[in-house]
A protein has these predicted regions:
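Extracellular, repeat-based ectodomains that mediate carbohydrate processing or recognition
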Residues: 1-277
Length: 277
């Protein structure tokens, strides 16, 4: 066990360019300011460099993704010192040190539940979030990393209802973005959409339900060995048990998925972990 401070809103990411772990967090010992630290794994042990500050205000809802094209890592977060705007900062790792560019606002409104992934097909960052400035709708935006900065296209709504929890991943087998979320507009059912990035824009197909009951805190990840997406979630209708569902996107999703169109999927099955929430 290695300790590196008293913290909150922790997120972890892997820098494949430098083979390092990056952790972003709110440093409770420093007024919840945003910090990041670089970790090195050696055998079964892990060591850390010195933490560095990327945001001198209260920081919440951090997430991390690595840009393999530029070798940079992007940290997204809610900047409570700036009206809780959704913000991103580009980081550079050198050895066990980390430095940052200038933070850039991607949502000039209350943003929360920020989730970011790198699209290796388009070489873009995609951020999904809860947009408090637009009726708490589920929203996504495409970012382009250049040097130590990042620029953004126009935000797009993927769920026109309150979206309390969400998670984003990239399916590299079909070059599509997958966003899993809790749909407050449909009895909190577990839902996902398939997104296609084109330039600095993203479009979505029709929503697909993966759990036909109240669902909370979905987390989506892509298994590159099996070429399947796994979504884990808390089943509110079954004693808050933790469950997972395996999703394989079928051939229809391998082409362009235009906004408003549908794509076939195979919901292979669920596994209950029998863990009470």
């Amino acid at each position: 066990e290695v300790q590196f401070g008293v913290l909150g809103h922790l997120s972890l990411g892997f820098d494949s360019t430098n083979n390092k772990i990056i952790s972003a967090f709110a440093n409770v010992s420093d007024n919840n300011h945003g910090y990041a630290i670089v970790g090195t794994v050696s055998g079964t042990s892990m060591s850390f460099g010195s933490s560095a500050k990327f945001e001198a205000e209260n920081t919440r809802f951090t997430d991390i993704a690595h840009d393999t094209d530029t070798g940079k890592t992007v940290i997204v977060y809610t900047d409570q010192g700036n009206s809780s705007y959704g913000t991103a900062v580009v980081s550079t790792v050198s050895g066990t040190s980390i430095s940052f560019g200038t933070p850039v606002v991607y949502e000039s409104a209350n943003s929360a539940i920020n989730s970011v992934v790198y699209d290796t097909n388009s070489n873009k960052m995609v951020i999904a979030y809860y947009d408090g400035g637009n009726s708490s709708y589920g929203t996504a935006i495409v970012g382009t990393v250049s040097g130590t900065g990042i620029s953004f296209g126009t935000a797009v709504v993927f769920n026109s209802a309150i979206t309390p929890t969400l998670s984003i991943t990239f399916d590299s087998s079909i070059s599509k973005i997958i966003i899993a979320y809790q749909d407050d507009g449909n009895s909190d059912k577990g839902t996902f959409v398939i997104g296609t990035v084109s330039g600095t824009s993203i479009s979505f197909g029709s929503e697909i339900i993966f759990h036909n009951a109240a669902t909370n805190q979905p987390k989506a990840v892509f298994d590159s060995s099996a070429n399947k997406v796994v979504i884990s979630y808390k089943d509110d209708g079954d004693g808050n048990k933790g469950k997972s569902v395996v999703v394989q996107l079928e051939s229809e999703a391998r082409g362009q998925v235009a906004s408003g169109s549908s794509a076939s999927v195979d919901i292979i099955g669920t596994v209950s972990t029998n863990q009470d929430g």
